[in-house]
Amino acid sequence: MKEIKLIVGLANPIKKYNDTRHNVGSWLVNSLVTQQNKKLKKNNKFLGYSTEINILSKNIHVLVPDTFMNLSGISVLAISNFYNIKLHEILVVHDELDLKPGNVKFRLRSSHNGHNGIRNVLAVLGTNIKFLRIQIGIGRPINSGYKISKFVLSKPNVSEKLLINRAILCAIRVIYDSINQRNVIMTESSLNSMLDHYMNSCVIHHN
């Protein structure tokens, strides 16, 4: 992950969406920024909240778009153009219906798999380019008749939130460790192997 220059946490704007399933990508970015003793600041130029963090002497920009999910690409394009960052140098974090709460995966893909935020990023920045993502599991509604659009905009229950936060903690540890592998090309497989190792040892701290 040595080539990563920007980490993006996809989310919907407006405070009422902060704790919803669709916003778990921003949960990871906020946790990462907090660990760095930094704060995300509103940046109208980038249509989002951004800051710069330093991981093992490597400066990395972080962004949470302040656009609705299906317009995320506009914000990502603004910051990537300003800093001359290419799509393959971006790590995007988002919610994933096909992973249960507590599960998380690194993916190197050029398809959106039905996610509207990723769909827009690809539409704006380039549809045939593979880029790295962290998929944070939110699961699917138990009732098959429950609308997905309503489900992703709802809040996970207490146990689900604990599982999601644990997955986020593990993913952040992989981000740190993979950046530390300066002369090693980290593949999707190697990142997920590292992730599996941490999933067996991550501890949740209750607030």
From Swiss-Prot:
A Pfam match: Pept_tRNA_hydro
Keyword RNA-binding: yes
Residues of the site described as Discriminates between blocked and unblocked aminoacyl-tRNA: N12
Reaction equations catalysed: an N-acyl-L-alpha-aminoacyl-tRNA + H2O = an N-acyl-L-amino acid + a tRNA + H(+)
GO BP, sorted A to Z: protein quality control for misfolded or incompletely synthesized proteins; rescue of stalled ribosome
Keyword Ubl conjugation part of the UniProt annotation: no
A GO CC annotation given for this chain: cytoplasm
Tree of life domain: Bacteria
Entry keywords, A to Z: Cytoplasm, Hydrolase, RNA-binding, tRNA-binding
Active-site residues (renumbered): H22
Compartments where found: Cytoplasm
Chief location category: cytoplasm
Site residues (Stabilizes the basic form of H active site to accept a proton), renumbered to this chain: D95
Binding-site residues, tRNA: Y17, F68, N70, N116
GO molecular function: peptidyl-tRNA hydrolase activity; tRNA binding
InterPro entries documented for this protein: Pept_tRNA_hydro, Pept_tRNA_hydro_CS, Pept_tRNA_hydro_sf
EC number: 3.1.1.29
Enzyme class per UniProt: hydrolase
HAMAP family, per database record: Pept_tRNA_hydro_bact
Function: Hydrolyzes ribosome-free peptidyl-tRNAs (with 1 or more amino acids incorporated), which drop off the ribosome during protein synthesis, or as a result of ribosome stalling. Catalyzes the release of premature peptidyl moieties from peptidyl-tRNA molecules trapped in stalled 50S ribosomal subunits, and thus maintains levels of free tRNAs and 50S ribosomes.
Similarity comment: family membership: Belongs to the PTH family.
Quaternary structure (record): Monomer.
Protein name: Peptidyl-tRNA hydrolase
Taxonomic source organism: Buchnera aphidicola subsp. Baizongia pistaciae (strain Bp)
